[in-house]
């Protein structure tokens, strides 16, 4: 049985330092996976800095449990928040706070045999100060159970 794994992932994508100067400094993630960070899909890699510590365990044969906690901050305070694929969903409007929010993610996978497997993924987004200060804000929960049959 595999040993437990502890990991960390970090992402940095540029934001626009000076709005209205005729130059766009915001990273453009062409063809990005909407759920690149979590099922919550509240942001995309444009003007985002994030850190994701994670932990994976294999308690029994065929069962994998993966957990992560992600911290999201705007890279540049003068730029807003973007959602997939790259829509500006919240303008900066002079707000200096950078904390967008945190996401707790959980994935439980169980492979019964080489043909049948089950997967349960969930994520819980906790709104940060920028979300709260820039408009409507609420925490969001997503869950996606799946069963796969390969032949």
List PLM regions with ranges.
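Outer membrane beta-barrel transmembrane domains
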Residues: 78-105
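Residues on the lipid-exposed face of transmembrane beta-strands in outer-membrane beta-barrel proteins
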Residues: 1, 8, 53-57, 106-110, ...
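Repeated loop/turn-to-beta-strand initiation elements of outer-membrane beta-barrel proteins
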Residues: 3-6, 62-65, 110, 114-120
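Outer-membrane beta-barrel translocator domains and adjoining extracellular loop/strand segments
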Residues: 18-26, 78-84, 130-137
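Residues that define the transmembrane beta-barrel architecture of outer-membrane proteins
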Residues: 2, 47-51, 100-104, 137-143
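Extracellular loop and loop/strand-boundary signature of outer-membrane beta-barrel proteins
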Residues: 38-41, 90-94, 129-135
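Predominantly the C-terminal beta-signal and adjacent terminal strand-loop region
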Residues: 113-146, 150
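Transmembrane beta-barrel strands of outer-membrane/channel proteins
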Residues: 8-12, 67-71, 120-124
